[in-house]
């Protein structure tokens, strides 16, 4: 089954990513596991840039119980990329970030995926309510689930 390919217009926050030589695998393209590092980068940069999140000192942190990625076309060093970010689901203590990886200048995504965070107390690891500053930042990039590639997942 062929998935519809997401386009830039469906994402609300973008962060540049430069591929590195060691991102490539023996087959000459970015290895599948590296995409998850790209996902983590755009999510955390959004939190730092837009919610004032301090990953080193925050009392609540996001832990990741679930990720997923669909690969649409290969990416390889030295491609310059942009990661697009939106929020597909925002709960009391959890959020599902939806991410697309674009080769710089391309309208269609090379890869799409999602990344779930559950916010927990840094020490106890018990779920906590998403703080107001973080929630406000997240609400600005929430999308209608109907338009999401991952709406049924």
Model regions: which residues?
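Residue-level signal for pocket-adjacent positions within structured domains
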Residues: 21, 25, 58, 123-125
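Residues that recognize and position ribonucleotide moieties
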Residues: 28, 37, 61-62, 108, ...
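Generic structural "secondary-structure junction" signal
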Residues: 23, 29-32, 65, 73, ...
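Hydrophobic beta-strand-centered segment that forms part of the acyl-chain substrate-binding groove
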Residues: 46-95, 109-110
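Generic structural detector for well-ordered beta-strands
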Residues: 16-20, 70, 116
